[in-house]
Regions:
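Small/aliphatic-rich secondary-structure junction motif
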Residues: 2-54
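Glycine-rich, Arg-bearing micro-motifs that act as flexible, cationic patches
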Residues: 111-133
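Short secondary-structure boundary segments
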Residues: 42, 115-116, 142
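Short, flexible loop segments at boundaries between secondary-structure elements
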Residues: 131, 136-142
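Solvent-exposed polar/charged
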Residues: 31, 104, 132-133
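Structural beta-alpha unit
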Residues: 1-2, 78-111
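General small-molecule cofactor/ligand-binding pocket signal
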Residues: 39-41, 87-91, 139
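A short acidic, glycine-rich active-site loop
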Residues: 58-70
Length: 142
């Protein structure tokens, strides 16, 4: 059985139940390895160049990223034991591209993510694209 010591947990902060399930899975998989590094990532998708985006304040993206970072830190504080090594990553861009780029850059052993939003059948388009284009193993949860 392969041991995973560097896990990337991709979460959607607007669906916390799925995020909690992904975290519990990663913690269970590394239960006997407290030195394993768990990287939790949340991706803020870009606003399309549209009429709506032209109405937003100049630093709107920075404010959104700062809020996402705060929410991710709050989430990890509530859902990870204090003694676990957790790295927080908030990225801005196309979800599947950012997840795959981060997985490569951080040389993770495994990506954990949810299949789709709660109550939806099948796989989300981002999950499919992460699986299709990633060079890393992926654990997709329902």
């Amino acid at each position: 059985m392969q041991l995973f010591n560097k896990i990337l947990i991709a979460v959607d902060l607007s669906h916390l139940e799925g995020a909690k399930k992904a975290v519990k899975t990663a913690l269970a998989m590394t239960e006997d390895r407290p030195d394993a590094v768990l990287r939790i990532v949340s991706i803020v998708p870009p606003l399309e160049n549209s009429f709506v985006s032209s109405l937003l304040p100049r630093n709107f993206d920075k404010d959104v990223l700062a809020e996402a970072n705060k929410r991710l830190h709050d989430f990890t504080q509530e859902n990870f034991p204090a003694d676990r090594k957790v790295q927080h990553i908030v990225a801005h861009g196309t979800v599947y591209e950012e997840i795959n780029t981060i997985a490569q850059e951080k040389e993770v052993d495994l990506i954990i993510m949810m299949a789709t939003k709660p109550g939806k059948p099948g796989l989300s388009s981002n999950t499919v694209k992460v699986a299709r284009f990633s060079e890393k193993p992926i654990l997709i949860l329902r």
